[in-house]
Amino acid sequence: MTVYINDLSCFTPFGDLQETWKGVTNNKVAYGPITKFDPNESRWTRSKVAGEFHFDAKEYPIITESERDRLPESNQWALALASQINLDGLDKSRTGVIVSPGFSMYLEILQSNKENADNIYHYCPDMIAHNINMKYGLTGASAMTLTACSTGIYSVIWAAMMIEMGMVDNVIAGSVDKTIHPDAFKQMGKLRALSTKYNDTPEKASRPYDTQRDGLVLSEGGALFLLSKHKTDNTICEIDGYAINNDAYQTVAPHPDGKVVQECMKDALKDTTPSLINVHGTSTPMGDYAELDAINRLGLKD
């Protein structure tokens, strides 16, 4: 069965979908100095650069005053993103939701006040999908995944699998991650995964595959996709293949030989040939090398 992507929405440090597309196609960068907290308060916050998304729930009438007070901001982002997905004509009993909060839930518990910290919405990561179910009356399967950097694409793959198995006809799938928080920078800083060499020139900090790369730039945002078994006049693309595996290696670094990455890409591409490769491209010395080596050994470098 072919699964189609019929709609999408996103929030990035550029802004919404239109602003993001404009920024990317004009070769702009959307990260800069950290403004959401003082990075000088901790010796572990060596990286001073971030891709921040600034959100005002009042700009989205779909989010009620009660929800603004009650829900973690990441959940509000998801509701706002879902409001930009066209659900007209869909059978709501056959429409599911797989949306995940990334690490937002844990960070929002840390920054919430005592009253909100006792709120179940801050403790149950699946509530982010459940809130979309309730808001739009979608009674199909509801779930979430949490797999670090691959959380969003995992959600999309599981959504496609659910459609192929006949469990649902449509799925809203994706992830949001509200990560600009002191503890995120402390923990990533301890792992030495963040760029620290370009604090004074933040526009140069993220440089995947560059010989001067020194780490990633922590950023935040989210994206949702509408997957369906039905092709429409608004269909954006179709899913021709996917694969999932893992290195069984280090927590924050791929195996340097890239063999497992190569196997995953080979499995995903068995029925298709790509015209564009969207790499992970973390701008870390080990990660970029292993990924590029795997691509080259697959013969996809051209």
Q: Where on the chain are the PLM-derived regions?
A:
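N-terminal amphipathic, basic-rich helices that act as targeting or association modules
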Residues: 1-8, 67-91
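Short, well-ordered amphipathic alpha-helical segments that serve as non-catalytic structural scaffolds
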Residues: 76-87, 126-129, 257-272, 294
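Acyl-CoA/ACP chain-elongation machinery
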Residues: 167-207, 213-214, 242-256, 279-289
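Condensing-enzyme catalytic core mediating Claisen C-C bond formation in acyl metabolism
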Residues: 2-10, 17-36, 41-45, 202-276
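Active-site-proximal alpha-helical scaffold in enzymes
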Residues: 79-83, 136, 143-177, 216-233
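Conserved catalytic cysteine-centered active-site region
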Residues: 32-76, 102-111, 117-158, 190-217, ...
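Phosphate/pyrophosphate-binding loops at sites that engage ATP/ADP/AMP, CoA/4′-phosphopantetheine
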Residues: 82-95, 135, 231-236, 264-276, ...
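Beta-strand segments within the central parallel beta-sheet cores of soluble alpha/beta enzyme folds
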Residues: 96-99, 142-146, 168-176, 236-242, ...
